[in-house]
């Protein structure tokens, strides 16, 4: 399970250090793709295979299912860590997530997300202001 928030810098070659806490969970090979909210989703290979199978089962007759499949899968890239624990992010994903220099890497249960620091800070500020309302609407956990 991935959790936590880490701030790092993207180097001139589009590489970013993956927090040591996440490296073991991601394994040697993993998949990065366009995520929701203009961030990058990063999945360990076992989680990716489960997700890919669910996408494969979407009905081809529905245009929304085809659009989602195309968007999600066409942006996917198999990645690996280098010896320094960095991931080299493809330019299409960096452009999609508007990654410049400062990035935020967060753990979200079964995946890792990579955000531009500016977008993450804005998103977090909005989410904090409405967290109680969101919790009332979607959470029924007694926490």
Curated annotation (Swiss-Prot):
PROSITE patterns per the UniProt record, alphabetical: SPOVT_ABRB (PS51740)
Coiled-coil residue spans: none
Domain (SpoVT-AbrB) ranges: 5-47, 76-119
GO biological process, one term: negative regulation of DNA-templated transcription initiation
UniProt-listed Gene3D superfamilies: Transcriptional regulator MraZ domain (3.40.1550.20)
Matching SUPFAM superfamilies: AbrB/MazE/MraZ-like
Alphabetized GO MF terms: DNA-binding transcription factor activity; transcription cis-regulatory region binding
Subcellular location: Cytoplasm, Nucleoid
UniProt cross-references to Pfam families, sorted A to Z: MraZ
The UniProt record lists the keyword Lipid metabolism: no
UniProtKB keywords: Cytoplasm, DNA-binding, Repeat, Transcription, Transcription regulation
GO cellular component terms, A-Z: cytoplasm; nucleoid
Family stated for the protein in its record: Belongs to the MraZ family.
Protein name per Swiss-Prot or TrEMBL: Transcriptional regulator MraZ
Organism of origin: Natranaerobius thermophilus (strain ATCC BAA-1301 / DSM 18059 / JW/NM-WN-LF)
């Amino acid at each position: 399970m991935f959790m936590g928030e880490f701030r790092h810098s993207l180097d001139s070659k589009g590489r970013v250090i993956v927090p040591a806490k996440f490296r073991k969970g991601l394994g040697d090979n993993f998949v990065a793709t366009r995520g929701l909210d203009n961030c990058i989703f990063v999945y360990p290979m076992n989680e990716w295979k489960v997700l890919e199978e669910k996408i494969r089962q979407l009905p081809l007759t529905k245009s929304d299912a085809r659009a989602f499949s195309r968007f999600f899968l066409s942006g996917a890239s198999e990645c690996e860590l280098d010896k320094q624990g960095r991931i080299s992010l493809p330019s299409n994903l960096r452009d999609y997530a508007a990654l410049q220099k400062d990035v935020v890497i967060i753990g979200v249960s079964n995946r890792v997300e990579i955000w531009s620091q500016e977008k993450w800070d804005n998103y977090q500020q909005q989410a904090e202001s409405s967290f109680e309302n969101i919790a009332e609407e979607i959470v029924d956990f007694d926490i």
